[in-house]
Amino acid sequence: MPHLHESELFHAIKNPAFRRIGLMGRARTRSVTQSIGQIAQIINDMNLTLIMDVQTANLPTLNLTEIERVKIVKRSLIGEICDLVIVVGGDGSILHAAEALARYRVPVLGVNRGRLGFLADVKPDEAAFKLRQVLMGNYQLDHRFLLTMEIREGRKIIHEDMALNDVVLHAGKSVHMIDFQMKIDGHDVYRQHSDGLIVATPTGSTAYALSGGGPIIHPSMDAICLVPMHPHTLSSRPIVVSGTSEICIRIHEDNRTQPMVSADGKPSTPLDQEQRLYIRKHPDKLTLLHPPGFDFYEACRTKLHWNVHAEEFSLDVDDDIMDDE
């Protein structure tokens, strides 16, 4: 990172790329609230307009008394009136914010206070420098598609939701497998006995689907991944289909448990035998903003520890042993 005097980080920027900056976060830990306060002060010191949603502004221990230019609005409005939205937390915080922001195509910058941080890729101690780079126009945009899910009974839509990562069919609290059938674009694919099915976007391929044995899919690909959860047949494997595909799932009449459906880990909804679950690409996309130098493969290496090896032992005979002989 180039060396800048601390005071230079907070100077106002002439003709910044973004002027109305939203700030969102969920206070799972004190560090999240602390970072939100620090970023709010940075934005204020740069003479930019800070916009916060009501939930974030009312977080416990968050003190905004020294912030001169702050507007507090409903969360549903923040994407409409902001040029850029900063989300503080982990990837879950960005998943939570995606529903409110995607339809406005407003760029989202994630500051990581979680664990992996595939979506929130800015470290808290780099926030001032990275934000300054972004405001000077040095950034790259990354458009991620979402999924829409509908539970239908006949022509009636019983429940609908959207997901950035995945839609998951699961057995809820039951220990029984689910018996279900799946079609893709009207074609029969299989009847399966398993603990469920993960339907993931490329973004979600590094989340729950990865732990289920699914492939990592580059976020630029137009594809959907179907990952069976503990299938009862060894031949059941993940399937990657076109991003334009429509997946239809029905519960077989021999099923013995109550299947549930969840989008991005939100509260689950039951799927009954007379209903159908439809999953396809959502018309909106979430626009992620990355500071200069973002590299998906580097993120994989770092966050999945691809380059971490056990201590390597030389195959050569130890010189000390040779000397002793």
UniProtKB/Swiss-Prot annotation:
Pfam families: NAD_kinase, NAD_kinase_C
Main localization of the protein described in the UniProt heading: cytoplasm
UniProt GO cellular component terms: cytoplasm
Listed GO MF terms: ATP binding; metal ion binding; NAD binding; NAD+ kinase activity
Alphabetical list of InterPro entries matching this protein: ATP-NAD_kinase_N, ATP-NAD_kinase_PpnK-typ_C, NAD/diacylglycerol_kinase_sf, NADK
Residues that, per the record, bind NAD(+): D91, G92, H96, N165, D166, H176, H193, D195, T206, A207, Y208, A209, L210, S211
Location of the protein in the cell: Cytoplasm
EC number(s) reported in the record: 2.7.1.23
Task performed by this protein: Involved in the regulation of the intracellular balance of NAD and NADP, and is a key enzyme in the biosynthesis of NADP. Catalyzes specifically the phosphorylation on 2'-hydroxyl of the adenosine moiety of NAD to yield NADP.
Family recorded in the similarity comment: Belongs to the NAD kinase family.
Protein name per Swiss-Prot or TrEMBL: NAD kinase
Gene name of the encoded protein: nadK
